Amino acid sequence: MNPPAIAIDGPAASGKSTVAKLIAKELGFTFINTGAMYRAVTWYVLQQGIAPADTEAVKAILPGIPLSFGKDGAVSTVMCEGRVLGEELTLQSTNDNVSTIAAIPEVRALLVEKQREYNLAEPVVMEGRDIGTVVFPNTPYKYFVTASEEVRAARRAAQGLTDSIAERDRKDSARACAPLTMADDAKLVDTSDMSIEQVVAYIAEDIHNRMA
């Protein structure tokens, strides 16, 4: 039996990454940012001069893609040829194309396998868009973190990103492979009128109570 896995899903700018990282620290679990994995593939595809919409070309480079996934302490890292990727993952070009890359079934299959490997030997808090529905469908600890479109748009603007929240939601929810959707047994957490501290306290208390 694998160690516990906490699944935190939600749309863009819902606050799920910050919440998941703090929950992991609270519990002493490893934090896994799956979005960084999809962003790394997106960045690499663009570096090769491949159009993200050219599905066959993207699929062709997957077997030899020089990305590796590890940890820095209790936080997951993504590396390209041994170099940890950082600002590359937050470039506007990466952000604009990650939904297209994430919709390719072969990309998702590759990364879901890597994501599950993290949980083979240690407990994890994993955030993304399909953690509770695809990666860990059997975990009892599922949370869907969201916020109003207006609040999320303001958060994106504060990060210096100019993409449309509505368009990103449409792409993530409409894709055929592992669309963004709330698991039937997940708890909905609306962060529109909550501070990060309140959200973390609510989820951490729920987890502690259920693990007791």
What are these regions (language model features)?
Residues 8:
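Hydrophobic anchor at the beta1->P-loop junction of P-loop NTPases
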Residues 13:
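Walker A (P-loop) phosphate-binding loop of P-loop NTPases
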Residues 16:
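Conserved lysine of the Walker
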Residues 19:
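Hydrophobic positions on the alpha1 helix immediately C-terminal to the Walker A/P-loop
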Residues 24-34, 47-51:
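Post-Walker A helix-loop "phosphate-sensing" segment adjacent to the P-loop in P-loop NTPases
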Residues 37-123, 150-151, 162-167, 196-200:
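ATP-dependent small-molecule kinase phosphotransfer cores
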Residues 70, 115-122, 129-138, 158-202:
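Small-molecule kinase domains that catalyze NTP-dependent phosphoryl transfer to phosphate-bearing small molecules
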